[in-house]
């Protein structure tokens, strides 16, 4: 419970820093695969704390005025159409990533429209490939008992590029003075190219998106690193999309690379913001 409260204070502190720079925060809370597909859990059920994580984070965001659409409700409506998550992995499929990107784009268009002319992007499907996900790596069967492993998923990768240029033509823009209106920060849900979440966001938003997402770091560390970057200080975006899987809320991040005084100040600012939000209710 103490890690949940500390992480919520950090989230509120991040919001305060973004507000100071005129950046709108869109919190994309990714529901756990087990929450979306409880019918496959069998007799094992999550504990009480895990059962309430998604709603706790969503309610905290709403209480503090953070834009955070209910992605769980949207995905529950979509799950009958196609697989939203890989069978052998905790991550989403390219289709699931696309549906989330489209829902986020509708939220942006309704609540925080982007400035400037929209850009056009196109997404193409690449050749399918077998994919054994991270859930399989938890099973100590390979190589001696590999015949007992479940069959791999058939992943259909997608690639998105701007219609203004060919997919590989980025050399001219590399040294151009371009301010990206949208920044994406998050985890492997955003960073891994197999899901094409970044590309799906670009197409759905009609805007280029600069990604600072990282795999294997959780959602908090990439965000804190971005807040300390020259890119944020010198050229803050109009909108920042923070992809945040619910399962990280109770986890204690390793903050040893950051100045403890800075972290303490972020959490203090977050606590103050929470008190103000509570008084306003």
Predicted regions and their residues:
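Extracellular glycan-modifying ectodomains
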Residues: 1-281
